[in-house]
Amino acid sequence: MAVGKNKGLSKGGKKGGKKKVIDPFSRKDWYDVKAPNMFQTRQIGKTLVNRTQGQRIASDYLKGRVFEVSLADLQKDIDPERSFRKFRLIAEDVQDRNVLCNFHGMDLTTDKYRSMVKKWQTLIEAIVEAKTSDGYLLRIFCIGFTSKDQQSQRKTCYAQQSQVRKIRARMTDIITNEVSGVDLKQLVNKLALDSIAKDIEKSCQRIYPLHDVYIRKVKVLKKPRFDVSKLLELHNDGGGKTTEAVVSAEGAVIDRPEGYEPPVQEAV
């Protein structure tokens, strides 16, 4: 056995050297997520994305992201009737550090949907595909339950199949008429107020009393060709030649000079 110093061990060796630790967040930027002007809360949060490097543009990675927000947070309301509705917003364009979103769907929370399903009643559901006046093809799911008559002594309140078919047909007609005559912005306002479900419940009372009638889910199947001007109208942004309007968190419009660049932050 040779006696002496091992030069490789004394220097640490090639594999044993310490690697430089780089914070991954130093390569990322924060962007503000903006909701359309049909909601009271304009800034719904922030999102992270890798900074633009070469051909990797940050805005391309932001477009298409889907954000799910409770209706109570969007409308600044503590009403329990709004808290179980979830709206999905999709990022369609990026202006400076603002991600402009549009409506992408609606759904009920799982706990609300499961709490409505009970024994001794009939569940009636209708699935309708309708097109808005501005070219959005939607698939709408409506749900309702039969209600027990106060004067009845029966434990159950089951509806006959003929009554179920009539109620489902009535649901389909009302949803088709309500959707086809309005644009997407007006339809979102109706979904927020739940006016379509209330009309269905009132119209079906003659066939069989209903309760817990809701628009359970809304899916966007097809969209018209993307138009920046229409999206900017939803965000109170006209877009001039000399100035560029940026939507603030409160919904006001701030004019900034053309070519404005936000200051670079030293730390994130």
From Swiss-Prot:
Chief location of this protein within or outside the cell: cytoplasm
GO cellular component labels: cytosolic small ribosomal subunit
Stretches assigned to coiled coil: none
Domain of life where this protein originates: Eukaryota
Region (Disordered): 1-21
Annotated GO biological process: oogenesis; translation
Pfam families per UniProt: Ribosomal_S3Ae
GO molecular function: structural constituent of ribosome
Alphabetical UniProt keywords: Cytoplasm, Developmental protein, Differentiation, Oogenesis, Ribonucleoprotein, Ribosomal protein
Compartments, record wording: Cytoplasm
Keyword rRNA-binding: no
Similarity comment text for this entry: Belongs to the eukaryotic ribosomal protein eS1 family.
Function field: Essential for oogenesis; required for late follicle cell development.
Subunit structure and binding partners: Component of the small ribosomal subunit. Mature ribosomes consist of a small (40S) and a large (60S) subunit. The 40S subunit contains about 33 different proteins and 1 molecule of RNA (18S). The 60S subunit contains about 49 different proteins and 3 molecules of RNA (28S, 5.8S and 5S).
Protein name: Small ribosomal subunit protein eS1
